[in-house]
């Protein structure tokens, strides 16, 4: 099995990228406006320890999806999880362009975008299933990730409020 056909590449890419965010977001927020329009970058979280909770939760999801994919030999599950991750990486580049500045996560995004595309292409070659399954699984995973992202930002905000006595 080659590196790019492993179901375990996605969690590794995720941790490499999110480590940059976890380390750099708090200091970046001290000197930069965190809003793009009405949307606040990084879910409004200002502390690395709280951000780490959200990163850990997402990492566990990626590990679970990779494990299930490995156990049932179903690469489409990892493909479906990699697509929102790729969009997340692209979003960092877009945010940096909009801000005309460095945004935490942009360096690893630039490094990882080509790697992630190659990874997706390798996994797609391994996926030999009906087209309807592609649509169902990809839509289900996108919806699950969107709901989870909203959920984890609410949880992180509440934890930050409680721990750092905000509000």
Stretch-by-stretch model annotation:
Residues 59-87, 133:
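Transmembrane helix-loop-helix
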Residues 15-22, 85-96, 143-157:
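Transmembrane alpha-helical segments that form the membrane-embedded catalytic/substrate-channel core
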Residues 1-22:
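N-terminal signal-anchor transmembrane alpha helix
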Residues 118-167:
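Terminal transmembrane helical module of multi-pass membrane proteins
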Residues 71-75, 93-103, 126-128:
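Membrane-interface helix caps and helix-loop-helix hairpins in membrane proteins
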């Amino acid at each position: 099995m080659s590196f790019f056909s492993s179901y375990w590449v996605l969690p590794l890419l995720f941790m490499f990228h999110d480590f940059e965010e976890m380390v750099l977001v708090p200091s970046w927020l001290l000197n930069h406006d965190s809003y793009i329009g009405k949307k606040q970058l990084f879910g409004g979280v200002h502390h690395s320890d709280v951000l780490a909770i959200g990163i850990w939760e997402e990492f566990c999801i990626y590990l679970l999806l990779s494990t299930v994919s490995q156990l049932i030999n179903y690469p489409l599950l990892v493909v479906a999880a990699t697509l929102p991750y790729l969009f997340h990486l692209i979003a960092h580049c877009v945010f940096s362009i909009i801000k005309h500045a460095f945004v935490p996560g942009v360096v690893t995004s630039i490094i990882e975008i080509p790697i992630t595309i190659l990874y997706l292409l390798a996994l797609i070659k391994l996926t030999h299933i009906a087209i309807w399954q592609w649509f169902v699984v990809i839509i289900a995973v996108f919806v699950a990730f969107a709901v989870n992202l909203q959920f984890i930002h609410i949880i992180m905000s509440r934890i930050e409020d409680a721990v750092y006595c905000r509000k």
